[in-house]
Curated annotation (Swiss-Prot):
This is Respiratory growth induced protein 2. Belongs to the RGI1 family. The lineage of its organism: Eukaryota, Fungi, Dikarya, Ascomycota, Saccharomycotina. It comes from Saccharomyces cerevisiae (strain RM11-1a) (Baker's yeast). Its main location: cytoplasm. The gene is RGI2. GO terms for biological process: energy reserve metabolic process.
Length: 164
C-alpha cells in the first residue's frame, strides 16, 4: 500500500462514548488528528469537537530511528532535555498545525498554563476565536508522564453563547 492509498482512506481513529454520553474521538497519529480537524472545519462542525491524541512526538521517533521499541527509558517528564524539546514541539509545531488545520493562522493561545508534579507535566492552552460568524473556545491540554515518552493531547472546542 502506497502513502497515497493510505491518505485517501481518511483519518484512522476510534470513537468512545464517555460516561456522560459525550462522543470522543481518539487518534494515535498526528497526521490523522490534523486531517480530522481540517475536515471538521470544512464541514462547519468545528465549534463543538472533543478529541484526544496519544502519540510519540516526532523528535522522539527520530532519535529512535522510527522504532518505538528503541525509545530510551529516559524520554519522560523527569528529563529536562525531553521536556524542553516537547515544549518546543508543542509551541512551534503542534499548536501551529492546529491553527492551520482549523484555518485560523492568527490564533495566539493567550491563555497558557503549566502544571508540574512528580509524575507528570501538563500544559494548557486556550483561546476564544470566531470562524464563519461562530464564536467558540479552543482548549488544548498536553500531558507528558514520568513513565514514558507517549504524549497525551486533549483538544476541545466549545461554542460561546452570545450575550443577550
Amino acid at each position: 500500500m502506497t502513502k497515497k492509498d493510505k491518505k485517501a482512506k481518511g483519518p484512522k481513529m476510534s470513537t468512545i462514548t464517555t460516561k456522560s454520553g459525550e462522543s470522543l474521538k481518539v487518534f494515535e497519529d498526528l497526521h490523522d488528528f490534523e486531517t480530522y480537524l481540517k475536515g471538521e472545519t470544512e464541514d462547519q462542525e468545528f465549534d463543538h469537537v472533543h478529541c484526544q491524541l496519544k502519540y510519540y512526538p516526532p523528535f522522539v521517533l527520530h532519535d529512535a530511528h522510527d522504532d518505538p521499541e528503541k525509545i530510551k527509558e529516559t524520554a519522560n517528564s523527569h528529563s529536562k532535555k525531553f521536556v524542553r524539546h516537547l515544549h518546543q514541539h508543542v509551541e512551534k509545531h503542534l499548536l501551529k498545525d492546529i491553527k492551520t488545520a482549523i484555518n485560523k493562522p492568527e490564533l495566539k493561545f493567550h491563555d497558557k498554563k503549566k502544571q508540574e508534579s512528580f509524575d507528570r507535566i501538563v500544559w494548557n492552552y486556550g483561546e476564544e476565536t470566531e470562524l464563519n460568524a461562530k464564536k467558540f473556545k479552543v482548549s488544548v491540554e498536553v500531558v507528558c508522564k514520568h513513565d514514558g515518552a507517549m504524549v497525551d493531547v486533549d483538544y476541545r472546542t466549545e461554542p460561546l453563547q452570545p450575550l443577550i
